[in-house]
Design a protein with these regions (language model features):
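Glycine-rich, aromatic-lined ligand/substrate-binding cores of catalytic
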Residues: 845-877
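Short aromatic-centered micro-motifs
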Residues: 55, 84, 192, 500, ...
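Short, small/polar-rich motifs associated with maturation and membrane association
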Residues: 1-362, 394-398, 407, 423-424, ...
Length: 998
């Protein structure tokens, strides 16, 4: 179905053509035939006028286009015929039959080939595309309870990995990775473009405002964004106002319940006494505490959205206001936010100018928790939570005790953040056709300028009172801190588009200029030892700690960056059969060395619609078949603003000749040769539509090579001041296959069934770690595991190997004392104490080789049902909770596996071996949505929809730890928790919603 944004744009073009071109299709005059004037109106199936529709007299080839009200007037011979056409609609031929007034209703084309897809700085019909671009309409997006739009895409697009390791935490945000890891240390996330403005924030978008999302996955599509396109581009198209002259009001509300899943079998007090206190009777503190339950609650979220939309063909508007109150499943986490969005679009009466403006303010008040469940897991269950004799009523853990009273922390500690966001943009466009007065109705010449600003102000406050357990132990009468961070980004985009069709040739061209300037600033201050707890963090100056000699308990910063670009693109097609696209972006960034600030990012793509060839006409079951190839160069500049410059920092106070001096010096090795990280991308694709458009989809093979990777590299000292330098070293390669298929299996009057299958493979390899300047390093270790016992590194990134390799000892059993035995490099069994780094090897990989999903959609009369499955295969997970809490030698509380599955390991500590590596494959019943829609069409109520959604219902897996989808698979340490063991429990989620349209 056509999206509203496309209709708006094409209608606007129609208006401009009407008012300025004076177009008339010329043909041979039919003097011998008697003609009469025939007028009429062209509308769509909803009754809205179709502006700019072509109305051609079949016999004379003369014609016109419909005006702003969809009306037309033509001279037609007796018994003549009219051919009425418009982009995205089925062409109709109408017999006049001596009628003077006609009404023509155009139907949208049933095929997805004419679906409009947003590309960089423009739109295209799907059948014209020569790149790997995925389009998702609003109705196909996930039903979510948050304003984090990234979760809308989970499982919807092949090779788009959306990971959220704490879905029930209202303050956690998902991470997005497209076609695998693309860098060592530079940014890994895609560029977000909202309504054509680069640099958007997916957390500042109400899902109710989203019309569609387009994902640019390959280099040719994303190269138009140059240095910011290396990790792919996500284009979010927001809804605009209606044009039927009516005011439409929509109210939607939902309530979400999150119930934590207790996936770890933690010992209770009785089990703890039976197993642990035999060897250490003093560890029994006499209580019976369930720390997990004590910090867990039922998470409840309320969302309300009110939308007003209206206007006519010249002016339309849309205003949205929303409120969200979310409570997480732990005692502390909550989030309250208020937001709005206002959009207005106007075309002048003469059709020469078009103006549009958007403003999106949002205020967020949140409380975050840290390390809640790591403490809940490891705390001694015989340790009491409360103590009536303490100053604040909570039991104070003795100094040196493992863990902490996390219930006290959640209730007594203040740790809040207030965030104020303001995003606005304004666009002015001019139709340049009147300057040339063309006679070609297919010609467009339009120039537009967009200015925008995105500002984020963040205020953090933290306070622990004098009665707080750790403060009492440390003899501190309260601690407090305040932080303020401000980020402002300004954009200017000037784009001119031209298109024309000459017989069977269509040419489109675009040129543009972009200017981006960002400033980040902030300050922080802290103090201790207050005379009163009453003012919390609101009177830092009253603390006594900062007054001590030499104390520096405050700081500030400011930095900026600039990005300037010139870009262009040319599209050509012949009969929509042979397709060609070329683009180039010339871009300069202030973040790189003096001689390397500018870079060129070209792209070329070709397509061949084989189905239009004569030799394919006999294959009636093939509706459309297109092959395409593209190559594009992208860049990555997501690094620190001053990484290429010499920077200095304070090193404290030092004595010299009896005097104290504040000493400054270089903060890092300077690299004036720092330059772009480049991605060389190739893609071969096949788009198909079969069996009267019942089966549609695409198949892609991609090859992406990232060179001059940005990151830290080890260097000798001296001659260098520091042991690492931030530079361009290394090459990384990703290859894979993608399949996206939709099958419209059943379509009757009352019942429909369709399903969508999405799947992708990924083969990742780190090709090299050296270049002509920096040589010798073949690998670097990553994922340093947290204490106790200083376990070391879990993974290694190495030349010729995949990212995510576990580099560990190989488990060979235990000795008579219950300590680890391992295999050495020769295959001999030795005690773990004799093991060296040379005895370690690659024992698994945490990066999935295959990811996929399947969504089933059913409708029966007014009911609709959606069932989505999602999974991953071909990867391993390091069971961190078994590693830290599943061994008898650990001093914290343990999982029951320490005395069941791992009972034979009695003295062995947490040594990194492949014993803890398990297959991570899983298949998840991800979500089920059942809805009922009442189309009332009453005077005051147009439509009511009720729905219920259940998320995260069940996971099929052989993994013995927590939900495998809570392990991070994006980034450089897939299959782990990044070296720690803190996690946020998986939760069953149920959403109940109501939508009313007036």
């Amino acid at each position: 179905m056509k999206n509203i944004h496309f209709k708006t744009c094409t209608c606007l073009l129609g208006i401009l053509l009407i008012l300025f071109s004076g177009i008339q299709v010329k043909g041979a005059s039919l003097e011998v035939q008697q003609e009469s004037k025939v007028s009429g109106t062209v509308t769509d199936e909803k009754g809205e006028p179709v502006i700019g529709a072509s109305v051609v007299v079949v016999e004379s080839k003369q014609g016109t286009i419909t005006d702003i009200d969809g009306k037309f007037l033509v001279n037609v011979p007796k018994n003549g015929h009219l051919k009425v056409s418009y982009i995205g609609y089925e062409t109709q031929e109408v017999a006049v039959k001596n009628r003077q007034l006609l009404k023509v209703i155009l139907k949208e084309e049933s095929t997805a080939l004419n679906e409009v897809v947003v590309v960089g700085y423009g739109t295209m019909k799907r059948k014209e595309m020569t790149s790997a671009i995925s389009h998702i309409g609003a109705k196909d997006l996930n039903q979510i309870s948050s304003l984090d739009a990234s979760m809308l895409l989970q499982g919807k697009v092949s090779s788009v990995s959306v990971s959220n390791t704490a879905l029930a935490d209202p303050n956690n945000q998902g991470s997005i990775q497209i076609r695998g890891v693309s860098s060592r240390n530079a940014g890994l996330g895609p560029l977000i473009v909202v309504n054509g403005v680069p640099g958007g924030d997916m957390t500042n978008i109400n899902p109710a405002d989203i019309e569609s999302i387009d994902v640019l996955k390959d280099g040719a599509a994303s190269a138009i964004y140059g240095t910011r396109g290396s990790n792919g581009v996500i284009l979010i198209n927001l809804k605009k106002g209606t044009k039927d002259g009516q005011v439409h009001t929509t109210y939607s509300t939902s309530v979400t319940f999150n119930k934590a899943k207790k996936e770890l079998d933690i010992m209770n007090a009785e089990e703890y006494r039976a197993y642990r206190t035999v060897s250490n009777p003093l560890s029994d503190m006499g209580a019976d505490s369930d720390w997990f339950d004590a910090v867990t609650q039922l998470g409840v979220t309320h969302m309300h959205t009110l939308t007003f939309s209206g206007g006519n063909a010249r002016t339309n508007y849309r205003v949205t206001a929303d409120y969200r109150n979310a409570r997480g499943i732990d005692l502390r986490s909550d989030r309250r936010e208020y937001g709005a969005r206002a959009n207005i679009n106007h075309t002048t009466k003469d059709g020469l100018f078009t103006f549009s403006a958007n403003i999106t303010p949002r205020v967020i008040d949140r409380n975050k928790s840290a390390n809640v469940y790591s403490n809940a897991i490891k705390n001694n269950p015989t340790m009491p939570i409360y103590d009536s004799e303490s100053a604040n009523g909570y039991y104070r853990f003795p100094s040196g005790t493992e863990g902490s009273n996390i219930v006290e922390q959640l209730n007594e500690e203040e740790n809040g953040t207030e965030i104020k966001l303001l995003e606005w943009n304004a666009t002015a466009a001019v139709n340049l056709l009147p300057l040339f007065n063309p006679k070609n109705p297919d010609m467009v010449l339009k120039s537009q300028v967009t200015i925008s600003q995105y500002q984020v102000d963040k205020f953090n406050g933290w306070f622990t009172p004098s009665t707080y357990g750790s403060n009492v132990n440390d003899g501190v009468t309260g601690k407090a801190s305040r932080d303020f961070d401000k980020s402002t980004t300004n954009n200017l985009e000037w784009v001119t588009n031209f298109s024309t069709r000459i017989k069977n040739h269509q040419i489109r061209a675009m040129v543009g200029y972009s200017y981006n300037y960002g400033v980040n600033s902030g300050m922080s201050a802290e103090n201790w030892n207050f005379s009163s707890d009453g003012l919390t963090y609101n009177n830092l100056g009253s603390g006594l700690e900062a007054a001590k000699d030499g104390k520096t308990m405050m700081g500030s910063y400011k930095n900026d960056h600039k990005l300037i670009s010139f870009f262009g693109r040319v599209n050509y097609d012949w009969k929509e059969r042979y397709l060609f696209t070329f683009s180039l972006r010339h871009e300069g960034s202030s973040r790189f060395g003096e001689n390397h600030k500018w870079g060129n990012f070209p792209a070329v793509s070709v397509g061949w619609r084989i189905s239009d060839e004569k030799f394919m006409k006999g294959l009636s079951w093939i509706d459309d078949l297109k092959v395409r190839y593209d190559y594009g160069v992208t860049g990555n500049q997501e690094i620190g603003n001053y990484n290429s410059l010499a920077t200095y920092r304070a090193f404290g106070w030092y004595q010299y000749n009896g005097n104290r001096f504040h000493v400054w010096g270089p903060s890092k090795n300077t690299n004036s040769e720092l330059r772009w990280e480049k991605g060389h991308n190739q893609n071969v694709g096949l788009d198909f539509s079969l069996f009267s458009h019942k089966v549609t989809g695409s198949f892609n093979y991609f090859h992406r090579k990232q060179s001059d990777l940005l990151g830290d590299y080890s260097v000798p000292v001296p001659p260098n001041l520091f042991s690492t330098i931030y530079t361009n070293v290394g090459t990384l390669r990703n290859t894979g296959f993608e399949l996206d298929v939709t099958v419209n299996a059943v379509r009757t009057k009352d019942f429909t069934y369709s399903f969508t299958l999405v799947g992708a493979t990924n083969n990742n390899k780190f090709v090299s770690f050296s270049n002509d300047v920096y040589k010798g390093q073949k690998y670097y270790s990553t994922c340093s595991m947290a204490n106790p016992n200083n376990p070391g590194y879990l993974q290694r990134i190495e030349e010729g190997e995949r990212i995510g390799n576990y580099f560990t000892y190989r488990y060979a059993g235990v000795d008579k004392k219950g300590d680890w035995l391992i295999y050495d490099k020769k295959g001999n069994v030795i005690p773990v104490a004799q093991g060296t780094e040379e005895d370690k090897s690659v024992t698994g990989n945490g990066l999935p080789k295959f990811t996929g999903s399947m969504t089933h959609n059913f409708t029966y009369k007014n009911f609709d049902l959606s069932v989505a499955l999602r999974g991953a295969a071909g990867f391993d997970i390091f069971n961190v909770h078994d590693f830290y809490f599943g061994l008898q030698s650990m001093t914290t509380n343990q999982l029951t596996t320490a005395y069941s599955k791992n009972a034979h390991i009695t003295t062995g500590k947490n040594v990194i071996t492949d014993y803890f590596i398990e297959p991570g494959d899983y298949l998840k019943i991800d979500n089920v949505t059942l809805g009922y829609t009442m189309n009332l069409n009453k005077k005051y109520v147009e439509k009511i929809r009720l729905f219920g959604t259940a998320n995260n219902l069940y996971t099929f897996t052989k993994f013995t730890g927590v939900d495998p989808s809570t392990y991070e698979v994006n980034g450089l340490t897939p299959g782990t928790f990044g070296g720690g063991y803190n996690y946020y429990p998986s939760a069953f989620q149920f959403i109940l919603g109501l939508q009313v349209s007036f």
